[in-house]
């Protein structure tokens, strides 16, 4: 329970496999758009600490410099594991703040992402898809398919709509 004014944020954690300086395939979302509520005046690091506690992750290093993350299953991903430019970065609302993680004061509805990069000099803030949005899109496709009913010449447009919706899921 939070006393005083509360600030609700979203938090995502995007990690990687340990693969050294070569062999990167893709990043993976470890925590997607978790709702984290902290007291007013809290820092981005406070949001991360609370999310990690809630989801069973732990920080390696300090809250002012996160040098690594350990997953609930005990796997650690640390700075320099995937090359000399690899490590953890953070973004708020799609942008990298010009202040350290323990210096950024969170605001209502901030979207905070802690993400691993293989090369900080060429880093891009990842987009985190909400699994609920994916399910809504899939449900919409299923509904369109079920609306087709018996396949006849007159159902051609319904089939085209369902196909277009399905194709949009795989983009």
Model-derived segments and spans:
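Ubiquitin-like/PB1-type beta-grasp interaction modules and other compact soluble beta-rich domains
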Residues: 1-133
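Beta-rich interaction/scaffold domains
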Residues: 1-4, 130-171
């Amino acid at each position: 329970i939070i006393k005083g004014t509360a600030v609700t944020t979203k938090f995502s954690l995007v990690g990687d496999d340990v693969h050294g300086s070569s062999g990167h395939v893709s990043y993976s979302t470890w925590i997607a758009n978790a709702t984290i509520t902290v007291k007013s005046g809290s820092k981005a690091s406070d949001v991360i600490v609370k999310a990690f506690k809630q989801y069973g992750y732990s920080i390696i290093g300090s809250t002012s410099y996160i040098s690594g993350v350990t997953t609930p299953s005990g796997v650690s991903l640390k700075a320099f594991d995937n090359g000399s430019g690899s490590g953890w970065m953070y973004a708020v609302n799609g942008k990298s703040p010009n202040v350290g993680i323990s210096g950024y004061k969170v605001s209502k509805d901030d979207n905070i992402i802690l993400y691993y990069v293989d090369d900080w000099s060429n880093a891009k803030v990842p987009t985190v898809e909400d699994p609920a949005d994916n399910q809504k899109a899939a449900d919409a496709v299923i509904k369109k398919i079920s609306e087709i009913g018996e396949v006849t010449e007159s159902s051609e447009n319904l089939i085209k709509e369902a196909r277009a919706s399905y194709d949009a899921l795989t983009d």
